[in-house]
Amino acid sequence: MASYLYGVLFAVGLCAPIYCVSPANAPSAYPRPSSTKSTPASQVYSLNTDFAFRLYRRLVLETPSQNIFFSPVSVSTSLAMLSLGAHSVTKTQILQGLGFNLTHTPESAIHQGFQHLVHSLTVPSKDLTLKMGSALFVKKELQLQANFLGNVKRLYEAEVFSTDFSNPSIAQARINSHVKKKTQGKVVDIIQGLDLLTAMVLVNHIFFKAKWEKPFHPEYTRKNFPFLVGEQVTVHVPMMHQKEQFAFGVDTELNCFVLQMDYKGDAVAFFVLPSKGKMRQLEQALSARTLRKWSHSLQKRWIEVFIPRFSISASYNLETILPKMGIQNVFDKNADFSGIAKRDSLQVSKATHKAVLDVSEEGTEATAATTTKFIVRSKDGPSYFTVSFNRTFLMMITNKATDGILFLGKVENPTKS
């Protein structure tokens, strides 16, 4: 009997803006915990943050001097779900690549933590929209293992669709239509080039819309404000402007300003501006511990802030990036996904991640013991401190319930969408 190698395509679609929208009508059967200390969930949240920064550093190497934007929680959730059907080295590489020590952390605890994460990110809120979901488009002739099918539905709330891949263009259109609908039209054509060997497509999407707790007033936006790209090039951008009380601090160890701006609801944005020439130092130091330090150390003060109004998008072929982070076996002929389908040889042929971010006056739309000292200016000084994000800066959007990074990016040039 002939042996065929079929492709599993893993795609991640996401989008992030901030507007006033109706809340989702999802059930709230899984309340958010008041504390996540010493639980599988807390470990997943912390390791997801470290994974986010490791993936960020890899993307910086792969795409130098370019805008970066992605959803680490979307990527890690997709990989964890894929590991449910992996065996031997394939499973080990996925879970260790996500940062788990399999000697100390049982696999069941890992999936329990992700289950809690998925539930936490689907609890409806009247103040913001945050929707994350997964879908499997499976070749209709492929017989999925009952255990895998049950676990992806139970633990990851994934939808499963029987799909006719004998007509790749029709299958592709169906999958792209699903992602477009789930991201409210922001992520389009994420799937390209399906072929007759495609057996399964795994899609994860995340969509975020929220208003600033303290919005900018459009009449104060400056139309042509200079923004330094690199060391010599200047572009002109619409620069939002306001004077308000925000959580703010100066990280003297990492030579950067850190500004926290809250959204209405359960989300927070961090804007991080390193001193000139200190971006690389900052990037190398990013970790879950760094983010916790900022979250706990910033203090409210009057700030005059200038932030560009911008829209950026990014697309990544993760099959070329993840192997450099130790997740290699997934993409070659040695992959063992016998937990997905017993009789067919499967490997991941392509892993696509696409993200879109809009930041405006109203808000954002996006489709995850230390000795460092923070400085808060003396009340005897100026009445407010001015910080202008008029050169390369980092932005991350976090979820208060999980302390997880939903979106992470670097704005090199806000005029490039």
Swiss-Prot record:
Glycans are attached at residues 101, 390. GO terms for cellular component: cytoplasm; extracellular space; membrane. Residues 1-23 form the signal peptide. Highly expressed in normal germinal center (GC) B-cells and GC B-cell-derived malignancies. One of its GO terms (molecular function) is serine-type endopeptidase inhibitor activity. InterPro entries: Serpin_CS, Serpin_dom, Serpin_fam, Serpin_sf, Serpin_sf_1, Serpin_sf_2. Keywords: Cytoplasm, Glycoprotein, Membrane, Protease inhibitor, Secreted, Serine protease inhibitor, Signal. CDD domains: serpinA9_centerin. Belongs to the serpin family. PANTHER family: SERINE PROTEASE INHIBITOR, SERPIN, SERPIN A9. Protease inhibitor that inhibits trypsin and trypsin-like serine proteases (in vitro). Inhibits plasmin and thrombin with lower efficiency (in vitro). This is Serpin A9.
